[in-house]
Design a protein with these regions (language model features):
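Phosphate-end processing signature that detects enzymes handling 5′-triphosphorylated RNA
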Residues: 6, 13-224
């Protein structure tokens, strides 16, 4: 079947009052991920043993990728027995911050009108729910720990799994560092301390972008 006309997004704005997610993503080898999980330095700063969850996320767009061209991503995620719809914008110039809105849903079905925030609704304006199609899926096993640093609190997520289209898949092994309190510089310092334990590299490519590249049949290893 004919593939949607998706492409790498460019530009994209962040409404001035948008809720902001500040996050640093690190790409690692699966074996190195296990090494870091057991590292003494991580145990010292972890607030507890952490939690593990299975996350299944459906990503939606129109057949001509109207949302991607607007620089936004619409996702519905299953977390246990809950369903959460998220709308995210592209990252700002520093590569860390982007707008993010979330709302609970009754099922794994997109509902753009469920967002109450006017900025979120404006980003989806003119895209009726009947025009949306399920483009790709991520299936992730996530271990999350809260890390207490001298000047920040960081949520550290170890993600393994796959991003899948109907006829292709891309493996995932990455760490997401999300700032909960403090300054964004703490994320980079934490990443440098991880680098003393394992090889890693910073990535600005989101799971959504990787999914769009699969849909567009780009080689998974290009531009990561």
């Amino acid at each position: 079947p004919r593939q949607p006309a998706c492409r790498r997004p460019g530009g994209g704005g962040l409404p001035p009052e948008a809720p902001v997610e500040i996050e640093l993503k690190l790409r690692v080898a699966p074996g190195d991920l296990d090494r870091l999980r057991g590292a003494e330095m991580l145990t010292r700063i972890a607030a507890g043993p952490g939690t593990t969850r299975s996350l299944t996320s459906f990503y939606y767009d129109t057949p001509d990728c109207a949302l991607q061209r607007r620089g936004v991503t619409l996702r519905v995620r299953r977390i246990g027995q809950r369903f959460v719809q998220s709308l995210k914008t592209e990252r700002r110039g520093d590569g860390l911050a982007r707008g993010e809105w979330e709302v609970a849903l009754p099922a794994m079905v997109p509902a753009p009108d469920a967002f109450d925030d006017p900025d979120a609704r404006a980003l989806l304006d003119g895209v009726p729910v009947e025009a949306l199609t399920h483009l790709f899926t991520s299936r992730i096993q996530r271990e999350t720990r809260i890390l207490s640093l001298p000047d920040a609190v960081v949520e550290c997520a170890f993600d393994t799994g796959t991003i899948e289209t109907r006829d292709a898949s891309d493996p995932v092994a990455e760490i997401e560092l999300e700032l909960k309190e403090g300054r964004a510089a703490a994320l980079y310092r934490l990443a440098l301390s991880f680098l003393d334990e394992i090889p890693l590299r910073v990535s600005e490519v989101t799971k959504a972008e990787r999914g769009y590249r699969l849909v567009a049949r780009r080689p998974p290893g290009v531009m990561y």
